[in-house]
Amino acid sequence: MEELIVELRLFLELLDHEYLTSTVREKKAVITNILLRIQSSKGFEIKEHVQKPEVANSLPAPPQMPLPEIPQQWLPPDNGPPPLPTSSLPEGYYEEAVPVSPGKAPEYITSNYDSDAMSSSYESYDEEEEDGKGKKMRHQWPSEEASMDLVKDAKICAFLLRKKRFGQWTKLLCVIKENKLLCYKSSKDQQPQMELLLNDCSITYIPKDSKKKKHELKISHQGADALVLAVQSKEQAEQWLKVIKDVCSNCTGTVDSDGPLSSSPVHKTELEKKLSSERPSSDGEGAVENGITTVCNGKEQVKRKKSSKTEAKGTVTKVTGKKITKIIGLGKKKPSTDEQTSSAEEDVPTCGYLNVLSNNRWRERWCRVKDNKLIFHKDRTDLKTHIVSIPLRGCEVIPGLDSKHPLTFRLLRNGQEVAVLEASSSEDMGRWIGMLLAETGSSTDPGALHYDYIDVEMTASVIQAAKQTFCFMNRRVISTNPYRGSTANGYACPSGMALHYDDVPCINGSFKGKKPPATANGITGKVRTLNSQPKKPESVSCVKRTASNAEQYKYGKNRVEAVAKRLQSKEEELLKRKEALRNRLAQLRKERKDLRAAIEVNAGRKTQVILEDKLKKLEEECKTKEAERVNLELELTEVKESLKKALAGGITLGLAIEPKSGTSSPQSPIFKHRTLENSPISSCDTSDTECSIPVNSAAALKRPPSSNNSPCRGHVLRKAKEWEMKNGT
């Protein structure tokens, strides 16, 4: 027993020179307490000194130096508390002593902060007061984190609380290495949960001003949510501020100061603008009043100083007023100068959301055109910073990417792809294409581009929106005042290209009167060019689309024309097949009728069986042909609908394809206008009548067909009659 006690004492002495975890230290303290009680009860203290040389001789490797003195913590409790360690202590770690009863050694409750069991309310911070009257700071004992790889080469590390999205708090191990802030969920993790670059950032210290608040450090990055960390005391906050200032000494940061002692009045103005325009952060917002702000470039550190009671009262009033102003400003946000647009920009906005292809991923970005540049922003509310800016001069606009993204268009410079953009609708795509064509300085007609992945109807919508935006943007470049200029209504055609806006032919071929009448959209039917001269009257003549001169007003839409021609040829082929089927069915029905009559005549004879077999085969063939005829009718109806859409879009596209009489679209706009030309109304000479006004293409397409000329009634009655005749036979 004596040898065991001596060996145990030596083992405990060796453990004194080793690094122990909190669990091992607790066990060591328990064993030491038991050993002291055994020694005091059996009186082994004297015997140990007598037998110590003998035991030492029995050891295989006796120590060459005398054993160290017994530490104070092994002595009875009457000798005093255990000594304090001299090693450096990490932040956020302490051991709390529990009151001891007589005859017992002190026990320690170790807090290693490695679990999420800690409450998000963080009440221990709320109970602290800065004055510290009658209180002593808790001593921080060393922890196992001090020798981990996580904190190696770290400038500072501590367990801090991070403010979450809905005001809750979560505990993280925060470490600053080089120029990064690494946040670990636990000291056992090898990968950080969050990594934040301290370049170009601003850090703000917000002291605790009530029991519901904490000492907070707010780290802000442009274009990202602020990171809010809670520290235990003002001293700890100053340490972190100093370290971050040293880390960012070679970087440029933004100033987020609200103090009256700021070195430049511009900083205060910028902060007030930011407070009035920024949205509430997901990590929570804290006011900067009575705070300390450190600029990341290390050149400036603004501190608020307490002054007299009068100044304190004025500060409180100022803080209250700012809070009220901020609450009111959340509902009514005054747009910044970047967000404000002129009245001309409101008509055709030069900004909007687009999907941008970046690193094989589609991301939604707020895009706007300004000063011949396409600027990408992360969000609509963040216009002070941009992700990338692309100069548009010299670029080429090409619609289409693949069939999965039909509303895509690309920007090319010298054959190299600069940007791939996707719109949300055909109108939006046309607006952006027209806008980019105008800003790039291109003389390409929006209708001359090839739209390979969208159908005819959508192509018409894209081209119409592109041409309107194209003319509008060029009109803004030519005339600073949209209501004053040499062109009609401020519209002009770029690079000497004639603008084909009204594609519907003018009735009777000319206008009567000195002034050309305006269309429904306020755009004159007379088309001018930038370099229009009196010597060339054909450049300013009105657009007249008839069968003779339709070829010269084509928009280069070879693909759309090919589709329409293909549909027409397919319709003709289906009509021929339908006619052949109809003749064959009529022949089969006649043969069937004759066979039935022959069976009635030859009833009871041997030939009746042969005739019945022929009748069965004939019935089967009739059913097959009838099913084929029904499928043919369905296919023909579908082709007619497609052809009708193609011919309706031909007005906007300027196609030289005309509907055939008696085919799918007898009520197409071209057919209607030809009817009007042959009607008595076309011979009227008054300039104020509706027949002499050129019709806008969009209005003509949106106009519902007249109920008097409905082509469906006779067709339905004819089909019903055919089915009745078939069922009757």
UniProtKB/Swiss-Prot annotation:
Residues 267-282, 719-729 have a biased composition (Basic and acidic residues). A motif (SH3-binding) lies at residues 71-74. Changing residue 453 to A: Reduces phosphorylation and abolishes interaction with activated SRC. It is found in: Cytoplasm, Cytoskeleton, Stress fiber. Residues 257-266 have a biased composition (Polar residues). Residues 153-249, 347-441 form the PH domain. Monomer and homomultimer. Interacts via its C-terminus with F-actin; probably involving AFAP1 multimers. Interacts with activated SRC SH3-SH2 domains. May interact with FYN SH3-SH2 domains. Interacts via its PH 1 domain with PRKCA, PRKCB, PRKCI. PANTHER family: ACTIN FILAMENT-ASSOCIATED PROTEIN 1 (PTHR14338:SF8), ACTIN FILAMENT-ASSOCIATED PROTEIN 1 FAMILY MEMBER (PTHR14338). This is Actin filament-associated protein 1. The lineage of its organism: Eukaryota, Metazoa, Chordata, Craniata, Vertebrata.
